[in-house]
């Protein structure tokens, strides 16, 4: 094994919630998902992960995994993204991931428009746009402590910390 792969492995061991054996199992899983052997997972390959294609937020999840905005998820991004869902990640990590789902433009805030877009993805046509906009406006108004019209991570965290958001972001999976 060369120094580059072992450096990557050491970085993953330091930066994620996985041990060496788990990373190796995930590497094998990644290689199966990477059907064209490109070294990264494209959107179609990502959608083939069990349970992902049925998730309305699958596209946003992939965008959050894709830390370098390349349009594909490489092995390091795959492991880093999955690490958040492990039972060993803390509530703060899970909430930060959830925040990133809403923070579409990655500016560190959830705007009214971003909240609307993500909630629209989740509710589909079950709510009229006007009703959904009322929910969005009320959510921002009730949780925007500093009055800047958008939610910071701390404001988001305060709004959701009493909910089961963090628990729902834990996967009990056989990796």
Swiss-Prot record:
Domain called EF-hand: residue spans: 21-56, 60-88, 90-125, 131-166
Record keywords, A-Z: Calcium, Metal-binding, Repeat
Listed SMART domains: EFh (SM00054)
Record-listed Ca(2+) 2 binding positions: 66, 68, 70, 72, 77
Residues holding Ca(2+) 1: 34, 36, 38, 40, 45
One example GO MF annotation: phosphatase binding
InterPro entries, A to Z: EF-hand-dom_pair, EF_Hand_1_Ca_BS, EF_hand_dom
GO BP annotation list: calcineurin-mediated signaling; cellular response to pheromone; conjugation with cellular fusion; intracellular monoatomic ion homeostasis
Pfam entry (one): EF-hand_7
GO cellular component terms attached to this protein's record: calcineurin complex
Binding site for Ca(2+) 3: 103, 105, 107, 109, 114
Domain of life of the organism encoding this protein: Eukaryota
Cited PROSITE patterns: EF_HAND_1, EF_HAND_2
Keyword ATP-binding: no
Assembly: Composed of a catalytic subunit (A) and a regulatory subunit (B).
Family: Belongs to the calcineurin regulatory subunit family.
Misc. remarks from the entry: This protein has four functional calcium-binding sites.
Protein name in the entry: Calcineurin subunit B
Species assigned in the record: Eremothecium gossypii (strain ATCC 10895 / CBS 109.51 / FGSC 9923 / NRRL Y-1056)
């Amino acid at each position: 094994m060369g120094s580059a792969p072992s450096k990557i492995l050491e970085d993953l061991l330091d930066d994620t919630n996985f041990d060496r054996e788990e990373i190796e199992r995930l590497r094998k899983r990644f290689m199966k998902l990477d059907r064209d052997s490109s070294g990264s997972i494209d959107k179609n390959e990502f959608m083939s992960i069990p349970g992902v294609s049925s998730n309305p937020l699958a596209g946003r999840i992939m965008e959050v995994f894709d830390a370098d905005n390349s349009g594909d998820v490489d092995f390091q991004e795959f492991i880093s993204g999955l690490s958040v869902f492990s039972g060993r990640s803390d509530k703060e990590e899970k909430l930060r991931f959830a925040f990133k789902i809403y923070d579409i433009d990655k500016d560190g805030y959830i705007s009214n428009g971003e909240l609307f877009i993500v909630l629209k993805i989740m509710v589909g046509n079950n709510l009229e746009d006007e009703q959904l906009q009322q929910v969005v406006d009320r959510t921002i108004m009730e949780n925007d402590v500093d009055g800047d019209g958008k939610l910071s991570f701390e404001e988001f965290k305060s709004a959701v910390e009493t909910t089961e958001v963090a628990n729902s972001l834990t996967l009990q999976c056989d990796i």
